[in-house]
Amino acid sequence: VIYGQSQGQSHKGFFSEPNDKPTSGLIVIHEWWGLNEDIHLMNEQLAGLGYSSLAVDLYEGKSATKVKDAFQLSTNLSNNEQRALDNIKQAYDYLKNEVGVEKIGIIGWCLGGKWSLRGALMLPRDIDATVIYYGSLIEDKERLATLEMPIIGFVGTKDRLHKQFIQFDQDLKDLNKDASIHFYQG
C-alpha cells in the first residue's frame, strides 16, 4: 500500500487488516534488516489479533541479508532522521484518516524499537501505546516527559542495551509514566 510521500518519493508499506472490524491500528517498524518476510508475517499475526497493521518501510524498498549491508542502511537512515519521522507521521495519518481507526499504537524491534520511541516522541498526544523491543533509547528526561501513552519495553539482560534500558525504566518511573520494562535472562 502507498501511505504517503515525501521529497517526491512514495512511502510504501505492507498493510494487513483483521477479518472483523479493527479494534485499533498499529504502525509496525522493521528491524535493521528492513521490511522483509519476517515483518510481513508479524504484521499478519497482529492483524489476526484485531489490529489494522501498517508495516512501514523506512529503507524505501531496500533490505539486507548481510550485517554490513544492514549497517549501511541503518546508517543512511540515521543520517536522514526527518525523512524517517515524516514516514512514520504519514503512516499515522493513513491509519487515522484512510483506515479510520481511532486508537493507534506503534511497535518496533531493534532499529524499529528505536524508531517506535522516536515516533511516540514526535506524536506524544496522538500515539496511544508504544512497544519497544530492544531498540536504542532517548535518554533526555525532558523529552520523555512529553510522552502521554502507555509504554512497554523488552530487553535481554545480556543485550548491549541492557544498562540503557535500566536507566530508561528509572527515568520513566521518576516521571510517573505508565510504563512497564521487562528484562529477560540472556
Predicted regions and their residues:
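Serine-hydrolase catalytic machinery in alpha/beta-hydrolase-like enzymes
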Residues: 1-97
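A short beta-to-alpha transition loop/helix N-cap that caps and shapes the active-site region
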Residues: 61-66, 137-143, 161-162
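Short phosphate-binding/catalytic loops that engage adenosine nucleotides
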Residues: 50-51, 100-101, 176-177
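Primarily recognizes the serine-hydrolase "nucleophile elbow" in alpha/beta-hydrolase
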Residues: 89-147
